[in-house]
Structures are given as C-alpha cells and as structure tokens.
C-alpha cells in the first residue's frame, strides 16, 4: 500500500536515488547467474533499483516512524512501531512477484545510508526471529552493525586441497567456515574500516568516518538476484571480508523441552589465496 500510494518521503527518495546512482549502481555486478532468457533488461533493472530504494525507506518508516508522513496527512503511518529490531519475510510470497529485500536489509543493517552515518538497524533476513534476537544482542553489546550470513560450508584443509590443488596457510591452516549466500549482509563486514593500528575492523557508528563509508561501498558488488530463487529480481550484496578481524558468531535456538539456547563461537576472519577463494565462492552461489 505504501509503495502503490506513495506513502513515503518523496524528497528523501530523490536524495536516496541520487546516492544510489553514485555509490551502488556503478558497482552493479554481471548478471552471470541467470540464463539469458531469465535476465532482466536494463530498463527492468533500473526499475528494480528504484523499487528497492523505496522499500528501504518504507521498511525504516515502519520500524521507527517518520514525521514527514504526518505532514503528508498519514498520522498513523507516521508513528511507526517503535521497533528495536525487525525482519522481512520474502520467500516466496513476495519474491516470486517483487524484488527481494537483500538491498534493504544490507543497507539498514549498515551504519550509514544516504542520510549519512547513523546507528545500524537490526533487520533479520526472512523474518528469522531467533537470529534477529541474536543480532540485537550483538548490536546492543558492541554498537556495531550485525552480519547476517549462512554458515554454508566447513572446508577442511584436505577438501580445499582436493578441489583447488592448493593448501590453506596461516590462521586458515586448520580449515575455514565459509559464510556466504546472504546478499543482505551489513556492508560494515567488508572490513574496509580500520582501527588506530591500521587493522581491519567493524566500528560502532560513532567511530565511522566518511572514508570508511566510501571504502565499504567501493568494496561491495551488487549482483542481480538469481531468478531461479527470486523470480521478482532485486540485487544482492557481495564482498570478500578482510582477514584479521576477531568475530563472534551467535545463534539463538529453541530446543524442545528446554527452551531458548544461545550458541556462541569465537574466531577470526582470514585472508586466503585468491585462487582458492574463487573456486570455493563459485561452489554455491556468490549472490
């Protein structure tokens, strides 16, 4: 309804599109996942960009409200839900028909957007409430944006050698967990921000700089969504995180007969041979 009836700040939308045209569309990736007959035309992709920018504004307005909507005569919509966290369920009722939520989720989970540097929102992919709670814990404890990603694969040293002919070294020598398949991951997780020692890191919003913002955007490619999964299209974020960042993975599970159980795993991001990364990245879906 908000989309169809234009219930969003049209001035902000114009500002957001100008920002997206400058920082995101130039990094649109090649449409290599879709068969030629499934690829959208340039005009259709441009329309998708416009749609997902509006989606982002509307999702934020639903969470926290927007006084501009009151000026437009939409008193109830202007209030929002005073949400500390939210989620978006797309598959398949939405994504079979409309562009997916990856861009909106990635950007809202990030510490900046077209309005500048700000606190990251907490928005769970596929309305995964348990993961949303874990993301909220992480955000409130650290002040940082939270990385939502699939634990797709554990790659043992032997498996990496078998499929690539190369060996993992350094901190990766005992094997790696490949976090992939989430085009909704916060751009802060690129690791393009650096601390005072020059080490890659994820910063709380009050430590972010304009240089950090531009570096995170530059490191992110927006690939057209795989239309075998997302018939409605959209764009998904893709990047390779810098190695050397300490990270904590969290997951809240509901165990029958026990209740909520929080899993924690501490580790590090690692740099690996680019040729190894290319092979592993293409084993599932880079988008």
Task: Locate each region found by the language model.
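Terminal amphipathic helices with adjacent charged low-complexity linkers/tails
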Residues: 1-12
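Anaerobic metallocofactor- and corrinoid-dependent redox/one-carbon enzyme cores
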Residues: 10-43, 49-287
């Amino acid at each position: 309804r908000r989309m169809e009836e234009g219930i969003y700040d049209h001035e902000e939308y114009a500002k957001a599109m100008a920002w997206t045209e400058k920082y995101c569309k130039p990094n649109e990736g090649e449409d290599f996942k879709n068969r030629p007959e499934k690829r959208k035309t340039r005009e259709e992709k441009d329309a998708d960009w416009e749609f997902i920018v509006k989606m982002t504004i509307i999702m934020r307005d639903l969470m926290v409200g927007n006084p501009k909507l009151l000026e437009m005569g939409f008193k109830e919509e202007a209030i929002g839900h005073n949400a500390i966290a939210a989620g978006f369920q797309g598959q398949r009722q939405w994504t079979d028909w409309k562009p997916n939520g990856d861009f909106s989720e990635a950007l809202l989970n990030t510490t900046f957007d077209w309005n500048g540097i700000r606190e990251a929102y907490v928005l769970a992919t596929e309305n995964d409430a348990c993961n949303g709670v874990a993301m909220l814990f992480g955000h409130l404890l650290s002040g940082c944006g939270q990385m939502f990603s699939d634990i797709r694969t554990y790659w043992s040293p032997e498996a990496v050698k078998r499929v690539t002919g190369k060996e993992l070294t350094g901190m990766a020598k005992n094997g790696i967990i490949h976090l992939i398949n989430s085009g909704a991951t916060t751009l802060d997780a690129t690791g393009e921000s650096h601390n005072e020692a020059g080490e890659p890191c994820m910063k709380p919003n009050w430590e972010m700089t304009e240089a950090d913002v531009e570096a995170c955007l530059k490191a992110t490619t927006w690939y057209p969504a795989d239309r075998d999964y997302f018939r409605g299209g959209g764009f998904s974020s893709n990047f390779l995180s810098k190695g050397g960042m300490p990270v904590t993975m969290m997951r809240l599970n509901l165990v029958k007969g026990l209740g909520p159980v929080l899993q924690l795993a501490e580790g590090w991001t690692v740099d690996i041979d680019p040729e190894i990364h290319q092979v592993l990245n293409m084993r599932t879906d880079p988008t």
